[in-house]
From Swiss-Prot:
Homohexamer. Its EC number is 4.1.2.53. HAMAP family: KDR_aldolase. The gene is rhmA. The record marks R74 as: Transition state stabilizer. InterPro entries: Aldolase/citrate-lyase_domain, HpcH-HpaI_aldolase, KDR_aldolase, Pyrv/PenolPyrv_kinase-like_dom, Pyrv_kinase-like_dom_sf. This is 2-keto-3-deoxy-L-rhamnonate aldolase. Catalyzes the reversible retro-aldol cleavage of 2-keto-3-deoxy-L-rhamnonate (KDR) to pyruvate and lactaldehyde. It catalyses: 2-dehydro-3-deoxy-L-rhamnonate = (S)-lactaldehyde + pyruvate. Mg(2+) binds at E153, D179. Keywords: Lyase, Magnesium, Metal-binding. Binds 1 Mg(2+) ion per subunit. GO terms for cellular component: cytoplasm. Substrate binds at Q151, A178, D179.
């Protein structure tokens, strides 16, 4: 029988190790595999803002499977039915967006666990996650390999952060800088001093609660700052942004009047 896969990403978070990631928004398995050969610790495959279908996510999971980079799937929302599908195609680590309350966090955690610990629907014999029924006792042991991360990205979520951190089954909390800054009254300005202060205090609160703290920083200096504050899973770029910047930079070498890449401070 096939052995249940371990989750190196979750194990490293448990140990407090720093993991550097990359955001994948290009929606193709080809680009995902290129990224997986680069050496990033983790790759966020985005189903919220990138136009990924379940089948697209499935193909990208297949593409990165032979490599050391660990995939994290972000579905468009945290419904029980969508979480079930994403887990069944083999995702072991989920990042659920827009979690504002402890009750939402509990519902999401329940959706990732089989009964009696949760409400995940049973279908292991037709699921890639269970190797189509070939992993012995899959349902009994799968919880240990699942990693659940939730996004805190609104003023409401910040007000409820301590309660969210207390929810059993939540392994880490990710600060969403773009939506958070907009919610705080500073749209498209995650670098505002007040937003920066709140990001710092939030990261420190998350780590003090014994949870992993995550962030996406497309500016290298911001990534370094978040690491200094204690964030231990940080994405340092977005594939589509890096690609467009490289295209602009190359064209500017050969066409007069063309500007190089615009420096972007946020996602």
């Amino acid at each position: 029988m096939n052995a249940l896969l371990t989750n190196p990403f979750k194990e490293r978070l448990r140990k407090g190790e720093v993991q550097i990631g990359l955001w994948l928004s290009s929606t193709t398995s080809y680009m995902a595999e290129i990224a997986a050969t680069s050496g990033y610790d983790w790759l966020l495959i985005d189903g919220e803002h990138a136009p990924n279908t379940i089948q697209d996510l499935y193909h990208q999971l297949q593409a990165v499977a032979p490599y050391a980079s660990q995939p994290v799937i972000r579905p468009v929302e945290g419904s029980k039915s969508l979480i079930k599908q994403v887990l069944d195609i083999g995702a072991q680590t989920l990042l659920i967006p827009m979690v504002d309350t402890a009750d939402q966090a509990r519902q999401v955690a329940s959706a990732t666990r089989y009964p009696p610990y949760g409400e995940r629907g049973v279908g292991a014999s037709v699921a890639r996650a269970a190797r189509w029924g070939r992993i012995e006792n899959y349902m009994a042991q799968v919880n240990d390999s699942l990693c659940l991360l939730v996004q805190v990205e609104s003023k409401t979520a910040l007000d409820n952060l301590d309660e969210i951190l207390d929810v059993e089954g939540i392994d880490g909390v990710f600060i969403g800088p773009a939506d958070l800054s907009a919610s705080l009254g500073y749209p498209d300005n995650a670098g505002h001093p007040e937003v920066q202060r709140i990001i710092e205090t939030s990261i420190r609160r998350i780590r003090a609660a014994g949870k992993a703290a995550g962030f996406l920083a497309v500016a290298p200096d911001m990534a370094q700052q978040c690491l200094a504050w204690g964030a231990n899973f940080v994405a340092v770029g977005v594939d589509t942004m890096l690609y467009s910047d490289a295209l602009d930079q190359r064209l500017a070498m050969f066409k007069s009047g063309k500007n190089g890449p615009r420096i972007k401070g946020s996602y």
